[in-house]
Amino acid sequence: MRALFYKDGKLFTDNNFLNPVSDDNPAYEVLQHVKIPTHLTDVVVYEQTWEEALTRLIFVGSDSKGRRQYFYGKMHVQNRNAKRDRIFVRVYNVMKRINCFINKNIKKSSTDSNYQLAVFMLMETMFFIRFGKMKYLKENETVGLLTLKNKHIEISPDEIVIKFVGKDKVSHEFVVHKSNRLYKPLLKLTDDSSPEEFLFNKLSERKVYECIKQFGIRIKDLRTYGVNYTFLYNFWTNVKSISPLPSPKKLIALTIKQTAEVVGHTPSISKRAYMATTILEMVKDKNFLDVVSKTTFDEFLSIVVDHVKSSTDG
């Protein structure tokens, strides 16, 4: 698709706005159906018919902080939302197998690659940290789970603190208490004498991909699942602990904010890029709050999974 440059309702083929696009260009039909937010700058509209735009990227613009914002057609968004629902159910269905893998290999006396994979998977399923590709570390010093170094691990008698700067220069901090099952394996893996050495020094991107492949999911699926899982846990906790309860709308907004703080991005990104919309629609129901208040978290999670599964099957 050709990128066209937008200014004051007009389209141009150049970013100096010297060469206007003809009035019969199909992109003008697209503009009749969408509203480009006035606060966006450097807007690019993609040349396509309205029918094509329904399933594609329509336009991109920069917000006040210089971040590029992407706007897609309705059917693209619907397909993306349905995909998130399927990912949530798929990961939930393999979590027992993942935990079995962790339990089997984390008991090893050596710190071989399988042991490191077990610790890696345990950390990922606890904190849902971004993967951390080596190229991002080299390009902009962005750290993820795979690129954690010993210097990012602070050990004390009662807890271990994991501190690093991730994507978009967001600072992350995770606390592992001595009572947590991750404490001893992480302590065993950390080498204070080599601060610049990678924590997972026997792993590579390929080894992690091969490991996760056996479960029929992708590593990024764990983060999508994790955001929704964290949202559900926070939502369940809020229903149990807040009195009087705010409206469902305010309760959802509060829970999304809490979830975003845990996983390290803004509430809007949490909702737009990770949340399964079927889950959001489900928890909007006032009557559903009564169900939540009478269940354990595992029961609540099972109810949600069954509902999402029935929606995807339908």
Curated annotation (Swiss-Prot):
Identify the stretch annotated as signal peptide in this record. Answer: none
Per the UniProt entry, the effect of residue 217 to P is:
Temperature-sensitive for DNA relaxation in vitro
Which Pfam families does the record match to this protein? Topoisom_I (PF01028), VirDNA-topo-I_N (PF09266)
Q: Which one of the record's GO molecular function terms can you name?
A: DNA topoisomerase type I (single strand cut, ATP-independent) activity
Q: Any idea where this protein resides?
A: Virion
Q: What induces it?
A: Expressed in the late phase of the viral replicative cycle.
EC number(s) recorded for this UniProt protein: 5.6.2.1
Q: What is the effect of changing residue 223 to K?
A: Reduced activity
| Active-site feature positions | 274
Top-level class of the enzyme under EC nomenclature: isomerase
Name of the protein: DNA topoisomerase 1B
| Species in which this protein is naturally found | Vaccinia virus (strain Western Reserve)
